[in-house]
Amino acid sequence: MKVSPRLNSALLLLFMILATVMGLVTVEARTCETSSNLFNGPCLSSSNCANVCHNEGFSDGDCRGFRRRCLCTRPC
């Protein structure tokens, strides 16, 4: 009993697609937040906050909250 080359190609393609889909498991790291020690005054610009946070060694920063504080973020 001979298997056709088209069937072999189709099965190989199916297995490759399944292996690719099953291999795409994404793990998301937790993010830790800390108030900036160097930022002074109300936080009106998230880009300024991010620059100050980068200088403090964090990966990013954002203005948040009612009091508009600069919060620095990094992976935990």
Swiss-Prot record:
Disulfide bonds join C32-C76, C43-C63, C49-C70, C53-C72. Keywords: Antimicrobial, Disulfide bond, Fungicide, Plant defense, Secreted, Signal. The keyword Secreted applies. One of its GO terms (biological process) is defense response to fungus. Pfam families: Gamma-thionin. It is found in: Secreted. SUPFAM superfamilies: Scorpion toxin-like. This is Defensin-like protein 5.
